[in-house]
Amino acid sequence: MRTRAYEHTLNSSTVPAGSPALEIRDIELRFGGVVALHDVGFTVTQGHIHAVIGPNGAGKSSLLNCVSGLYHPQQGSITLHTGDGGTTHELTKLPPHKIARLGVARSFQNIELFSGLTVLENLMLGRHTHMKQSIAASLLWFGPAQRQEIAHRGLVEEVIDLLSLQAFRHKPVGSLAYGIQKRVELGRALTVQPSLLLLDEPMAGMNSEEKEDMARYVLDV
């Protein structure tokens, strides 16, 4: 069963369920003479979970890096659908920050969090693509900037509740167990309010109990 918080607040997609959300066609990625991806193509439908399965070195992370803009394939197309009006975006030439603003969020195979910051601070960083006030106004923290941060904090608190992170809210991420850190990284991706969520081996290195918890959270999303 989906949680009320995610259905009503965190999911930014307006693509109808069952319609194409992402279309990948004939992708080829090379690093010098090494072919990482060749003739890769599939369609991701809105409201569904899709898995890319393969052995180590098969190119799974490279494919996600292409979708999120960290890599740019030499050929092929990656088309993101962002609305029920037929709006599409070609991602193969876009930088990562522009793809993130289109609603694509991801976690990484190796944890990419700020270990010296608290869980709350790491999750607030996921809201940066939605912040509209200037740095100066944010530093002074008054008027619109204050109201903006309060609104962002409210959404982050929903993510904390969704992922059962209440007990770790003010703890530095670097002091937490590995499984909790993976959960925080999922949370940071969710605070982007993604229309497309990419999870790179979200259960790697976890014990069986942590895997069960993560599977439950992903299904809730």
Model-derived regions: residue spans:
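Glycine-rich phosphate-binding loops of nucleotide-dependent enzymes
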Residues: 2-221
